[in-house]
Amino acid sequence: MGNMFVILAALLFTGTIGGLSGSIGMGLFDLMNGYASSVPKTVILKFGIGAIVGCVAARGKNKNAKSPIKWISIASGILILIGIVLFFTATSLGNEIVVSGIEKKLVINPVLYIFSLILGLGLALVCTFAKKLSIEIQYAVLGAVAGIAFNLVGEFLFGVFKLLLVGSGFLPAILSSAVSLPATLINGSFSIFVAVALYVPLSKSLSNKKVNL
């Protein structure tokens, strides 16, 4: 839920506002609930999500902005390709793959390819009906995807770094950090769809209020 509100705030207002609201609010939550060690990661990632979403979405408000459908199509293709590769890898080799020289097995959680395919197909639908969507909404979708992509990479890298600090080997750290990605991907997919769905009516409401003022 937290990422969804960060994205929504960044879309409705600015990336700075969205990033600050997310980093401060979720950072304080971690601090007050016994997760003090996670505060730096939370602050950096949530601000990054807001900043990236706001930066990308702001381009859609430019009168001369061109449709970003090419980039949405690329994102859709990448996600679908990842989902297909993971699916066939899991079905042919199994969900648990033994990597030579590493004790821990590489686990391909079905959630990874299922939600990768769902998100990819969702973006494909956006591309299909792009002509019915304004340039602003198209950039909002692209911004939300970019923000969640940043969060996925950030969560993974922070996880690897944290494990390396406590003495883990490099490859085991990578595998262990990858285990948390399914939950992050589910949260991210939910955040993108809900934030954009709420943004459409709320942005119109805010625009009408500005006109009335």
Can you annotate each of these PLM segments?
Residues M1-L213:
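Loop-helix junctions at membrane interfaces
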